[in-house]
Design a protein with these regions (language model features):
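Structured catalytic-domain cores with a bias toward divalent-metal coordination
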Residues: 1-244
Length: 244
């Protein structure tokens, strides 16, 4: 499926230096708009050569901590502060995020269970295909921000799936330590089928995730853990320098 071209498009030039903001255009042909599209926000901040880091939130639309933190980061992060490239997708499943729901109100799909997606599928499958084929395919590191959403509340944690690649596992542990959530844990790889973790593994991307609070709210404590953790994560990836 990944070899078939994505129908999603963006005005972002991922090879261009500087800060760019815009949208991934998700085709959505309906009665009121035959050639309509849904706007998935995206930013690319690049300065010269270096690693590429992909930051994602809003996979589940009712998980707000990551969406708030990444939206703020887009405004704050300057090209001259980095070496390499940071790609930020704060509302990955835009239909779900707009509605404040875990799953998409358009096709009822859970974006974090359907990777590698399908370029000819329903909107959620098309999003999953784009993220894996166009974004994870060019990334070295990834951070997938989650919380408990409306129905769960997690202790603030950094998480990832167990893998067979020892070097990749070692780096994931380093990134978890750098993120410095109160808790960190690995879950069995069998639980990762269809998830961003599974997609990252296929693309040899060193990716960790988070579970930061929930209950359909945003707490100042979890938001601070998220914001500070993102900065330490970027430092550990080597894309920004620690301030002295």
């Amino acid at each position: 499926m990944l070899k078939r071209p994505s129908k999603l498009q963006t005005t972002i030039d991922f090879e261009k230096n500087g800060k760019q903001t815009g949208y991934i255009r998700l085709p959505h042909s309906v009665h009121r708009s035959a050639y309509g599209w849904l706007p998935i926000p995206i930013a690319c901040i690049k300065n010269g050569s270096g690693v590429t880091v992909l930051l994602i939130s809003g996979t589940h639309g009712d998980e707000y901590e990551g969406q708030v933190a990444l939206s703020k980061l887009i405004n704050q992060l300057k090209p001259e502060e980095i070496q390499g490239r940071v790609i930020i997708v704060p509302m990955a499943n835009f239909p779900a995020a707009k509605a404040g729901l875990r799953t998409s109100p358009i096709d009822e799909q859970n974006l974090n269970r359907i990777y590698p997606g399908d370029p000819d599928g329903s909107p959620s499958f098309m999003i999953a295909h784009y993220i894996e084929s166009q974004l994870l395919s060019i990334a070295d590191y990834g951070l997938d921000l989650h919380s408990g959403g409306s129905s769960l509340h997690y202790v603030p944690s950094a998480v990832s799936a167990v893998g067979e690649n020892k070097e990749r596992m070692k780096k994931m542990k380093e990134l978890m330590k750098a993120f410095a959530a109160p808790y960190s844990f690995f879950f069995p790889s069998g639980h990762a089928d269809g998830t961003t973790n599974h997609a990252a593994s296929r693309n040899n991307v060193v990716l960790i995730g988070t579970e930061l609070g929930g209950s359909g709210t945003v707490s100042p404590e979890c938001l601070q853990i998220c914001e500070l953790g993102i900065k330490r994560f970027l430092q550990a990836c080597g894309v920004i320098q620690a301030k002295t």
